[in-house]
């Protein structure tokens, strides 16, 4: 049997706030958004133009068995990586738009990397070719 990686699902505390972060700061397109009767929660699917990989944001109400509490600020998920043309410029742009700084740009091997942090504490890697 063969498997194909399809998406990453991460739990968020405020679905609207997280959608706004990924849409407005990272340019992701918002796809389906649905309530789930079985969990009491709601999810939204996002993707970047030109990519088949999906990001699923999941929100569950406190008091349900699906809610993770106390919330650990993204500790369960290490980071999400986005390729870009210029990691330095992307970092400056996202911080100027309100993203929390993670690590300022640095060079690692043949890549230029920088990190910002989303509203739920998940680190976002910005990666470009080193100059």
Residue ranges and their predicted role:
Residues 1, 31, 42-45, 82, ...:
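Vicinal oxygen chelate
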Residues 21, 88-93:
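Short amphipathic alpha-helices within nucleic acid-binding modules
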Residues 71-75:
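Short glycine/proline- and charge-enriched loop/turn segments
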Residues 50-54, 62-64, 87-88:
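Short, charged/polar surface micro-motifs in flexible loops or helix N-caps
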